[in-house]
Regions:
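Non-globular targeting/processing and membrane-anchoring segments
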Residues: 1-56, 76-86, 99-109, 123-188
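General small-molecule cofactor/ligand-binding pocket signal
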Residues: 88-90
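Structural microenvironment flanking redox-active thiols in thiol-disulfide oxidoreductases
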Residues: 92-98
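Residues immediately flanking
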Residues: 62, 92, 118
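Short glycine-rich or small-residue beta-strand-to-loop segments that form or flank ligand, phosphate
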Residues: 56-62
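Acidic, Ser/Thr-rich peripheral helices and adjacent loops at domain boundaries
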Residues: 108-118
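Conserved redox-active cysteine motifs that mediate thiol-disulfide chemistry
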Residues: 63-70
């Protein structure tokens, strides 16, 4: 795993979502369009509101990246619904040394999400796509047609991707909540 001091250092340089999008206003429109189409259900909002352990979530991204456009706003929606989630963003190429530690399938893919405890101990690393995203891409790309990188994905696929990301946030929250180390620290 990545040393907590490294994660803490990169996190300190990372940006909140809106500031990250402002780094390239010419590309922010695609992100905003996905954000406008994305809504959490009442059940999802309730689950996220119940989180009690603080988690630092660092997204290594590329504002130019189609997968980041399709998934990044979903991550932002999840974080908006829970005061326990501190979500920050870094550009893969700006933080190249850190990103090199997070290769997926041998490449510098994005988005990659680093989930860390309140003290920056790494709990999980996820990326670059959820299972629902891979299934959707396979349906569209493995055959006679090919998807355009910026094309809107079907609403049911987007909802499934949102739920899978939410599941990962929930999994990490339970990991943090049940951690003997953190339970001892918080006396619960």
């Amino acid at each position: 795993m990545i040393d907590r001091a490294v994660v803490e250092s990169v996190f300190a340089r990372a940006m909140p979502y809106e500031r990250y999008l402002a780094t390239d206003p010419s590309r922010a429109g695609g992100w905003q369009a996905v954000s406008d189409r994305t809504a959490l259900t009442e059940s999802q909002r309730g689950e996220l509101a119940s989180f009690t352990r603080r988690m630092h979530v660092l997204v290594v991204s590329g504002i130019w990246c189609g997968d980041c456009v399709q998934q990044g706003p979903l991550l932002a929606r999840i974080a908006e619904a829970s005061p326990a989630i501190d979500l920050r963003w870094v550009d893969r190429d700006v933080e190249a040394e850190f990103s090199a530690r997070l290769k997926v399938c041998g490449g510098g893919r994005v988005p990659v999400v680093v989930f860390a405890a309140e003290d920056f101990e790494v709990c999980a690393i996820a990326g670059d796509r959820t299972l629902a995203r891979y299934r959707g891409l396979a349906r569209r790309q493995l055959g006679p047609s090919c998807e355009l990188p910026w094309a809107e994905i079907p609403a049911d696929e987007s909802a499934a991707v949102l739920q899978e990301w939410l599941n990962e946030f929930e999994r990490v929250q339970w990991m943090l909540r049940l951690s003997p180390r953190l339970r001892q620290k918080h006396g619960d």
